[in-house]
Amino acid sequence: MTRVYLALYKGRKRGTSPRELWQRLMDWAVRIATRGQYSHCEIAVKHGFTDDYHCYSASLRDGGVRLKTMPLPADKWDLIPINQLDAYIDILNYFAQTRGKPYDFIGACGVILGIKGSLKKWFCSEWCAAALGVQYPDRYSPQELADWLGQPEKARQKS
């Protein structure tokens, strides 16, 4: 059985380069503005018997909707199991429709300011919510999507 999760970034970027400082500032700004502990989210699918996950999301750092394979260490990421029937197939189909679409910075700000973003661009929690079939996906921050789905899985299990 394919294990699908909402992965929520709670980590703190380390480093002192201008790029790393900018990323840290942006993570902090998202957490403050949304009054939450998360600054980003992904739909994560366990990848075989490794510690890696196939992660689907819209990312400002990566330029828009993309798939990325990466580990999700428990000190930086919380995982909430998605127990939706056919969730994996739904995610794959939605990704096929939206892959490569640009990041929606104005839409991400709109979660806080109440303004609409672009219908042709995506921000992380909007993309994840839409892929899961949530109504009005553009209204969700990473924290609000986590609250909607439930509490993070505390004990990670190998699948």
Residue ranges and their predicted role:
Residues 1-159:
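Cysteine-nucleophile amide-bond enzymes
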